[in-house]
């Protein structure tokens, strides 16, 4: 089973409708979408995680929005909220979800909102992922492939970005004590564990570390 990380770049940095409305509330930052369900009537049930802003102001914006059919909020700590919304269908969003359905692919939450767009992880059969990406070229929303890798349910997203060989290198380095202080293993030790040269072990580990750090800092 494979997974791919995609970055969606909607116009103006938000999808039309409730996403755009939340983005426009002063002080509010959309951190991510924890759950997204495409319901039988065509509407969406979504659970946003947001930070900042005022709970009353957020509620007023959602109540006044024509496309919001239902909404609710729950506090997640200081200036943190989970926002549930049931919203009317958007053609651009449904077009993307339809592609996932047609190719029997999984949308692996959460969907992470960053300054550069919406980061999404999709998982499924490798051939189906390739076929689906060919279809998304016809969708209005610009989409970029950020990374590809294996898929293990419940695994941190940062590890999903690694190739099998990079994962092996990182696991070997960790188990051998490469990250201990003082360091208990060398590239020679890692190379021996992987049946490769020290220089190859170094390269695999460097690339794995770069992908993990990029995932943690860039979303």
Language-model features, listed with the residues they occupy:
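Linker/hinge segments immediately adjacent to helix-turn-helix/homeobox DNA-binding domains
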Residues: 91-165
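Short alpha-helical "packing" element that flanks the helix-turn-helix/winged-helix DNA-binding module
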Residues: 166-173
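Short alpha-helical "recognition helix" segments of helix-turn-helix
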Residues: 184, 190-194, 201
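Short, Lys/Arg-enriched C-terminal cap helix and immediately downstream tail that follows
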Residues: 207-219
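Short helix-to-turn junction characteristic of helix-turn-helix DNA-binding domains
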Residues: 173-180
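DNA-contacting interfaces and partner/effector-binding or oligomerization modules
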Residues: 1-124
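Alpha-helical oligomerization segments
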Residues: 195-196, 213
